[in-house]
Swiss-Prot record:
InterPro entries: MJ1316, UPF0248. Pfam families: MJ1316 (PF04457). Belongs to the UPF0248 family. It comes from Saccharolobus islandicus (strain L.S.2.15 / Lassen #1). This is UPF0248 protein LS215_2790.
Length: 80
């Protein structure tokens, strides 16, 4: 399954529990090199980027996405 398909599946099939899902990305500015982004922060996804709801209009390239997890039970939904 492609990243875009996994993101869209969660956004549409689990929208009532969207806060329970996070996207883990590579982030060079953090100490451990990883950053968690809640699905509630996600505005859109296309074939190349994730677009976040923010004043800075943050755009994240999909090649930085490592995995998608469910927080409640730490289940791995998708992994590169």
């Amino acid at each position: 399954m492609k990243i875009k398909d996994a993101v869209n599946m969660i956004r549409w099939e689990y929208r009532e529990k969207i806060d329970d899902y996070v996207i883990i990305i590579i982030d060079r500015l953090t100490e451990n090199g990883l950053k968690e982004i809640s699905f509630s922060e996600l505005d859109a996804v296309d074939n190349n980027y994730l677009y976040l709801k923010s004043e800075e209009n943050t755009v994240i390239p999909l090649h930085r996405v490592l995995m998608i997890k469910r927080k409640s039970d730490n289940a791995l939904i998708w992994k590169r």
